[in-house]
């Protein structure tokens, strides 16, 4: 079993436990994370669980989390970047949350091109793990239940786009973005729930576009390069889709810091191209 196999097994085991205990953290506040956002108790709890599961694997050199200010040195090997509980504010209303993990063959900060694997856990009506690895030709999906993992199949983005989920209030987004957003929303079904993993799962299943643009409140975008944008871009591009920060693939974004943010768009290539073209005219 190589290091990527051990990471995959550890994530499956930890996700089983997280899935069964989320209700215990539905209404627990916990302060602010290093990005200045409100934490819930589940954020810190999940981060501790995944740290214990991943940081001590032979071949892991560093662990970076959305919930920690600094990278933790673990020895030599791959660098882990994780959002342990994406969409955690959804817990209070009993809506879907997730876990996002990027595995980098480089010291952090690093561009997404340095990744060798991306893992996405969705805690919904049932729990799934979607994984892309450099040593596999397909994006695999696994069903996690009753302490076991069952391979369900593989993802290839549908050729026809049917859904769209674009974040941000109309009054906080640029006119150019609102124009292209309205065009997409006239033709596609709206799917936006406030947890990036859950919203992207809609795009992977049905085809379409997910995005978090520049807004007045988040002038650099809201999602973080290491913990959300690049790992999900790796997954989407491996499944035949495309990613963008508005002008280039998210895998080409070069972050200066661990918690750097970027505008984020993920989905069918023709929609991403159309979005980039519209934004380039401003």
From Swiss-Prot:
BP terms from Gene Ontology: fructose 1,6-bisphosphate metabolic process; fructose 6-phosphate metabolic process; fructose metabolic process; gluconeogenesis; sucrose biosynthetic process
Catalysed conversion reaction: beta-D-fructose 1,6-bisphosphate + H2O = beta-D-fructose 6-phosphate + phosphate
InterPro entries found in the cross-reference section: FBPase_C_dom, FBPase_class-1, FBPase_N, SBPase
Keywords assigned by UniProt, alphabetized: Carbohydrate metabolism, Cytoplasm, Hydrolase, Magnesium, Metal-binding
E.C. designation(s): 3.1.3.11
Binding-site residues for Mg(2+) 1, renumbered to this chain: 66, 83, 85
Protein name (record): Fructose-1,6-bisphosphatase class 1 2
Species per Swiss-Prot/TrEMBL record: Haloarcula marismortui (strain ATCC 43049 / DSM 3752 / JCM 8966 / VKM B-1809) (Halobacterium marismortui)
The organism's taxonomic lineage, starting at the top: Archaea, Methanobacteriati, Methanobacteriota, Stenosarchaea group, Halobacteria
Designated gene of the protein: fbp2
């Amino acid at each position: 079993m190589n290091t990527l196999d051990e990471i995959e097994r550890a994530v499956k085991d930890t996700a089983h436990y997280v899935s069964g205990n989320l209700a215990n953290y539905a209404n627990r506040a916990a302060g602010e994370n290093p990005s200045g956002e409100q934490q819930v108790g589940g954020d810190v709890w999940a981060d501790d669980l995944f740290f214990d599961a991943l940081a001590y694997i032979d071949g892991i050199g560093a662990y970076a989390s959305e919930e920690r200010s600094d990278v933790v040195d673990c020895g030599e090997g791959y660098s882990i970047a994780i959002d342990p509980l994406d969409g955690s504010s959804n817990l209070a209303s009993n809506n879907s949350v997730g876990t996002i993990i990027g595995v980098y063959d480089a010291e952090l900060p690093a561009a997404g091109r340095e990744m060798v694997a991306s893992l996405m856990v969705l805690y919904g009506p049932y729990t799934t793990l979607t994984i892309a690895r450099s040593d596999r030709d397909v994006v695999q999906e696994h069903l996690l239940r009753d302490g076991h993992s069952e391979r369900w199949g593989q993802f290839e983005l549908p050729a026809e786009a049917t859904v769209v989920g674009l974040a941000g209030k109309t009054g906080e987004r640029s006119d150019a973005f609102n124009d292209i957003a309205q065009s997409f929303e006239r033709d596609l079904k709206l799917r936006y729930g406030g947890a990036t993993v859950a919203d992207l799962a809609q795009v992977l299943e049905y085809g379409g576009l997910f995005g978090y643009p520049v807004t007045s409140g988040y002038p650099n975008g809201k999602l973080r390069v290491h913990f959300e944008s690049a790992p999900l871009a790796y997954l989407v591009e491996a499944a035949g889709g495309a990613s963008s920060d508005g002008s280039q693939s998210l895998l080409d974004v070069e972050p200066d810091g661990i918690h750097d943010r970027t505008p984020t768009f993920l989905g069918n290539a023709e929609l991403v191209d159309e979005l980039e073209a519209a934004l380039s005219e401003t």
